[in-house]
Amino acid sequence: MSLRTPKRSRTSDEQEQEQEQEQVQNPDTHVNNEHQQRPGPTTLLSTPVRLKNGFGTPSPPSPPGITKSITKSRRRPSTTSLQGIFMSPVNKRRVGITAHGRVYDHNDDGHESESEDDENEEENENQKKYDGHVSMPLLPPTTPKSRRSEVFLSPSPRLRSPPTAARRSTGERPIREISHTLRTRLNYALVKLQNGWTDKTLPELETELAPAVQTPPRRYHNRFPDSADAGTSAHTAFLQALGGHPPREEATAVETLMLLSSPTKKQQHRPVPATSAGEPTDETEPESDTEVETS
């Protein structure tokens, strides 16, 4: 039974020695390897481009034997070199562009078909955009209190429409007078509708209603109470003045009413005022007439 010794893991010194030997044997592949390890103009998220004559055109693929040696001799870049690459402003901008969804066109071999000139033009355009960007001033936040105050503010004259501004004149009556006249006209129309005067005009109504409005003048007799009267107050004197009428006028009014009610007896009563004052008049006759009429 044979014991096999475990294989030792190769140290970094042994790997470096092997790489030096391969470089001596294949100097052409070493040159291509350096070109691959050099950070090109492409982004870190995309595949590397093989440089030829200083341009970004892809070179034809190498034979399979050479590619194997290249993969063996490929070294992992140190952290310091990665920090230098990521911290450069150009790479920062490139990483930002790729984060926004920039997609490169690839050819059949899987390499990028974008040249250095196109990348330089895009970098210049992006730089112009960043330089020409003007920061907008921040607006103050809108609060309920500010919104309420804006509602009550009147608009400036510039915001008014031209016909509205031209229609308003200095000699125009204010709105309250217009509303007062409109209210008066509405009240007048309501009174006409309630009394059935819709077909009549204002002059016709004035001529018809003028006699009804006028009241006949009343006679005022300023009769002071005598010393013999019991009531000497001013209130009783005022009541007597209002209620006192001359008896002769009252009798005359009754007589005219009787004459108008019985026109046949008007002739019988005509000679009564023609008699002399000394002759006695028959006062019982009209009473009998009134009794006959009532029966």
From Swiss-Prot:
The modification Phosphoserine is found at S59, S62, S88, S113, S115, S154, S156, S161, S262, S288. Residues 102-113 have a biased composition (Basic and acidic residues). GO terms for molecular function: RNA polymerase II-specific DNA-binding transcription factor binding; transcription coregulator activity; transcription corepressor activity. The keyword Cytoplasm applies. Keywords: Cell cycle, Cytoplasm, Nucleus, Phosphoprotein, Repressor, Transcription, Transcription regulation. Residues 153-168 have a biased composition (Low complexity). The modification Phosphothreonine is found at T47, T57, T290. Induction: By transcription factor HCM1 during S phase. It is found in: Cytoplasm; Nucleus. GO terms for biological process: G1/S transition of mitotic cell cycle; negative regulation of transcription by RNA polymerase II; regulation of cell size; regulation of transcription by RNA polymerase II; traversing start control point of mitotic cell cycle. Residues 114-124, 280-295 have a biased composition (Acidic residues). InterPro entries: Srl3/Whi5, TF_Nrm1/Whi5. Phosphorylation by the cyclin-dependent kinase (CDK) CDC28 controls both subcellular location and association of WHI5 with SBF. One of its GO terms (cellular component) is SBF transcription complex. Residues 1-171, 249-295 are annotated as: Disordered. Its main location: cytoplasm. Present with 1440 molecules/cell in log phase SD medium. Belongs to the WHI5/NRM1 family. Interacts with the heterodimeric transcription factors SBF (SWI4-SWI6 cell-cycle box binding factor) and MBF (MluI cell-cycle box binding factor), each composed of the transcriptional coactivator SWI6 and a sequence-specific DNA-binding protein SWI4 or MBP1, respectively. Transcriptional repressor that negatively regulates G1-specific, SBF- and MBF-dependent transcription. Binds via SBF to promoters of G1-specific genes to repress transcription in early G1. During G1, phosphorylated by cyclin-CDK CLN3-CDC28 and progressively hyperphosphorylated by CDK associated with other G1-cyclins, which leads to dissociation of WHI5 from SBF, activating SBF-dependent transcription in late G1. Elimination of CDK activity at the end of mitosis by the mitotic exit network (MEN) allows WHI5 to reassociate with SBF to again repress G1/S transcription. This is G1-specific transcriptional repressor WHI5. It comes from Saccharomyces cerevisiae (strain ATCC 204508 / S288c). The gene is WHI5.
